[in-house]
């Protein structure tokens, strides 16, 4: 089964993403902080990381830098409530970027696309 890690400091977002992605057949773990995400990434193998950019404490971009150094090849989808980052995301070494929304169609589509791309 494909395993995803969702990292967001907002509990409601973590639960929503986990529920929706689980319904699509993925095994989903969640983390509410960079420290929790780092611990899970050391303990388990993941096929995809869904990562909020702006979090209290360690930011999503700081976590992304660690992932790029330590877990080369792990695909990452960045999420944020702000559309203003969209033009810059390609320089952040992420595979995709989505704007948070109550409609998770874009997130689900990007999860499928990124996973398919990395399985080739």
Language-model region placement:
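Short amphipathic alpha-helix used as the core "switch/output" element in two-component signaling
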Residues: 39, 61-72
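Charged docking surfaces used in two-component/phosphorelay signaling
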Residues: 15-23
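Active-site residues of response regulator receiver
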Residues: 52
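Alpha4 helix (beta4-alpha4-beta5 surface) of REC/receiver domains from two-component response regulators
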Residues: 62, 82-100, 105-109
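Acidic catalytic/metal-coordinating carboxylates
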Residues: 33, 59-62
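The feature encodes the CheY-like receiver
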Residues: 14, 56
């Amino acid at each position: 089964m494909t395993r995803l890690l969702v990292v967001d400091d907002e509990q409601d977002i973590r639960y929503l993403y986990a529920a929706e992605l689980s319904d699509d057949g993925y095994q989903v773990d969640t983390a509410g902080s960079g420290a929790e995400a780092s611990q899970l990434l050391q303990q388990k193998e993941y096929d995809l990381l869904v990562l909020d950019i702006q979090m209290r404490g360690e930011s999503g971009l700081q976590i992304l830098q660690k992932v790029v150094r330590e877990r080369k090849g792990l695909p990452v989808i960045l999420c944020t409530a702000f559309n203003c980052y969209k033009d810059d995301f390609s320089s952040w070494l992420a595979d995709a970027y989505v704007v948070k929304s109550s409609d998770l169609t874009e997130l689900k589509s990007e999860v499928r696309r990124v996973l398919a791309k990395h399985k080739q």
